[in-house]
Swiss-Prot record:
The protein, known as: Cytochrome c homolog
Species per Swiss-Prot/TrEMBL record: Bradyrhizobium diazoefficiens (strain JCM 10833 / BCRC 13528 / IAM 13628 / NBRC 14792 / USDA 110)
UniProt keywords, alphabetically: Cell membrane, Electron transport, Heme, Iron, Membrane, Metal-binding, Signal-anchor, Transmembrane, Transmembrane helix, Transport
PANTHER family: CYTOCHROME C
Upper lineage: Bacteria, Pseudomonadati, Pseudomonadota, Alphaproteobacteria, Hyphomicrobiales
PROSITE patterns: CYTC
Encoding gene, per UniProt annotation: cycM
Similarity field: Belongs to the cytochrome c family.
Amino-acid positions noted as binding heme c in the UniProt annotation, renumbered to this chain: C84, C87, H88, M151
Changes after translation: Binds 1 heme c group covalently per subunit.
Annotated Pfam families: Cytochrom_C (PF00034)
Length: 184
């Protein structure tokens, strides 16, 4: 290869680089981006007033469960609880699935029993029994009521639907608990 051919190749490469450089400067001058003062996006989130003793679940219910249970329907609760059937069973002596069998859960100890179901450490650590109020908070926001629970369900936001499900769960027992009366 002689020097004339080499000069043509180097000239073409340098010319291409020069064209790219001029094009880049021109594009930046015409379309200069407006850089924000602080990089990223601000996401405005309302603070939840219920981040208290119960892990934020207290604010989930707008009405007391005692009042809601007065108008709750076991039949509607059975229909609404079908979505729970993907992970739970409801019949007496039924098998555990991803979640435990829920027959007779109202008034039972939290994180214990349930035919050998392996509860999460968070559920075992919470202790206590499943009261109507605790079930309401848990079904509204499982991870808010018991942070670290293995239950992946997001919760039931509608108060009346939760009350129906709780009334249904209460009916699943040989000795259902009396529904609490609404305090005035």
């Amino acid at each position: 290869m002689d020097s004339f051919e080499l000069n043509k190749i180097l000239g073409a490469v340098l010319g291409t680089c020069l064209i790219l450089l001029v094009t880049s400067f021109t594009a930046n001058a015409l379309f200069s981006p407006k850089m924000p003062e602080k990089p990223g996006f601000e996401i405005a989130v309302k603070e939840d007033a219920g981040h208290g003793k119960e892990g934020g679940a207290a604010a989930a219910a707008s009405e007391p469960i005692e009042k809601l249970l007065q108008t709750a329907s076991v039949e509607k609760g059975a229909a609404a609880a079908k979505k729970c059937g993907a992970c739970h069973t409801f019949e007496k002596g039924g098998p555990n699935r991803v979640g435990p069998n829920l027959y007779g859960v109202v008034g039972e100890a939290r994180g214990e029993g349930r035919n050998g179901f392996n509860f999460s450490a968070a559920m075992k650590g919470k202790g206590g029994t499943w009261t109507f109020d605790d079930l309401n908070k848990f079904i509204a926001n499982p991870k808010g009521f018991i942070p670290g629970t293995a239950m992946g369900f997001a919760g039931i936001p509608k108060d009346s639907e939760r009350a129906d499900v709780i009334a249904y769960l209460n009916s699943l027992s040989e000795h259902p608990k009396p529904l609490p009366t609404a305090s005035k």
